[in-house]
Amino acid sequence: MKRHYEAVVIGGGIIGSAIAYYLAKENKNTALFESGTMGGRTTSAAAGMLGAHAECEERDAFFDFAMHSQRLYKGLGEELYALSGVDIRQHNGGMFKLAFSEEDVLQLRQMDDLDSVSWYSKEEVLEKEPYASGDIFGASFIQDDVHVEPYFVCKAYVKAAKMLGAEIFEHTPVLHVERDGEALFIKTPSGDVWANHVVVASGVWSGMFFKQLGLNNAFLPVKGECLSVWNDDIPLTKTLYHDHCYIVPRKSGRLVVGATMKPGDWSETPDLGGLESVMKKAKTMLPAIQNMKVDRFWAGLRPGTKDGKPYIGRHPEDSRILFAAGHFRNGILLAPATGALISDLIMNKEVNQDWLHAFRIDRKEAVQI
């Protein structure tokens, strides 16, 4: 371990890994610290949907940022594979966002003018996915809302960053960050280092660092419970989505089903009630799923914020300190754009001011400092 880095990134989930990669691309002397294994917690628990249209209901700066990040994924797989040899396992079948009522139809058809979104009648949906529920009224087909396997995206980011010169430290928690003259002091069990810039990207566990650095931004854990089943019986090529529940087909033959939303629950173990509610919604979309064999089940902690948007940007009083945390349900989707934005800020490049304003650390909608 060196004594000094140009940039230290705290948190080895998909957000921190993406930041380390984009900084390494800029030839920044970068270190990435993770208390456990890279991508081992919230990132591995995610289904990996790149659902800009599914998750973002308002056409604001957040939606624009999500669409930008979704577009970045189009060339990302090849770029990372060339450096890391890791396949991010992108599945390009698209998504059916299902309607089960006239109210659903009216809401979904507000997206008709968007690129890559098409309305399908009930008959057209069932022609494409014959095992979807016969109770649907139709669906919006979203061609660009594809999915990846998050653990492998994170792994690819980490290996690619390392190939470009970043130093990676697993099982090395950052204990403390403080301002020390012209440099920033970072304390770890393996030794102390200094950095010109520090980026906090520790998901729901970022609150400790906000507090150490004089900020009161709160993070709320929102537990999500998922399961996977083996699908040996029916064809399913597209993600099915309704009422914040999804069924995602994997190339392995598994279907990933999720997810609950339990605010304030720090437990990373699913409970029977949560799994039951997920399966109830899944059977509504795909009745045949009730006969499939269970593969496994798990839970993860989404990093929630007061207004549901992430913190991405500089410390309001110290431009050397940056934050990228609080991505809630959208960490996988937003990772490329977040990594590039943080890198651009550190490199003093021109950035989109609407995004900076929407995600600024001191926005009144989210926190009082």
UniProtKB/Swiss-Prot annotation:
Q: Name one Pfam family in it.
A: DAO
Pathway membership, UniProt: Cofactor biosynthesis; thiamine diphosphate biosynthesis
The Swiss-Prot or TrEMBL record lists the needed cofactor(s) as: FAD
Its annotated compartments are: Cytoplasm
Q: Which GO terms describe its biological process?
A: amino acid metabolic process; response to herbicide; thiamine biosynthetic process; thiamine diphosphate biosynthetic process
Summary of activators and inhibitors of this protein: Is competitively inhibited by glycolate.
The UniProt entry, under SUPFAM superfamilies, shows: FAD-linked reductases, C-terminal domain, FAD/NAD(P)-binding domain
> For this protein, what does the record note about how its cofactor is bound?
Binds 1 FAD per subunit.
**Under which EC number(s) is this enzyme classified?**
1.4.3.19
Record function comment: Catalyzes the FAD-dependent oxidative deamination of various amines and D-amino acids to yield the corresponding alpha-keto acids, ammonia/amine, and hydrogen peroxide. Oxidizes sarcosine (N-methylglycine), N-ethylglycine and glycine. Can also oxidize the herbicide glyphosate (N-phosphonomethylglycine). Displays lower activities on D-alanine, D-valine, D-proline and D-methionine. Does not act on L-amino acids and other D-amino acids.
Subunit structure as annotated in this protein's UniProt entry: Homotetramer.
Its recorded name reads Glycine oxidase
Q: Tell me what gene encodes this.
A: thiO
